[in-house]
Amino acid sequence: MIALLDVNLLIALAWPNHVHHRTALHWFDRNRKSGWATCPLTQSGFVRVSSNAHTLPDARSPREALALLRRIVGLPDHVFWQDDISIAAGDFIDEKKLHGHRQITDAHVLAVALRHGGRIATLDRGITHLVPAPHSAKEVVCVVID
C-alpha cells in the first residue's frame, strides 16, 4: 500500500540533524519500493518548515527548500496525489474525533491518503486517533518511530 509521507516525516528524511533522521531513512529504505506519495499540503508544509529559521537551525530560503523538495520527489517510486478533499463536506474525516486546532491538518492529510486508497506514514502517534470508521489505525497509519 502506498504511503503518504506527512510533513514531519519528510522533514526528518531531508535534514540530517533531525532527531529522527536515521529512523526515517531506515524506514524509507525498507518501504519506498511499495510506493510513497506527497500531496500539495505536504509539499507546501515541507517548504514552509524547511525555510523557517525558528523551526530549523539550518533553514534555507524558500527557493532552496523548493529545490530540495524537487530532489526528494525525484527519487524512485514517488507518486503525487491530488488533493480534492473538502473538509466542509466531511469526506473521510470524523469530526467527532477532532478536539483541537492542531489535528485539522493531520486529519486532512489522512483524508487524502484514504481517498487514494493508501496510508499515512508519520512520526506522530496522535494521528492514529483520527482514523474514521470503517478503517483501522493499524491498516492506514504507519508510525515510523517506536
Placement of each model-derived feature along the sequence:
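Acidic, PIN/NYN-like endoribonuclease modules and their adjacent C-terminal/linker elements
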Residues: S86-H99, L110-D146
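Acidic catalytic patch
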Residues: P16, A37-S44, L66-L98
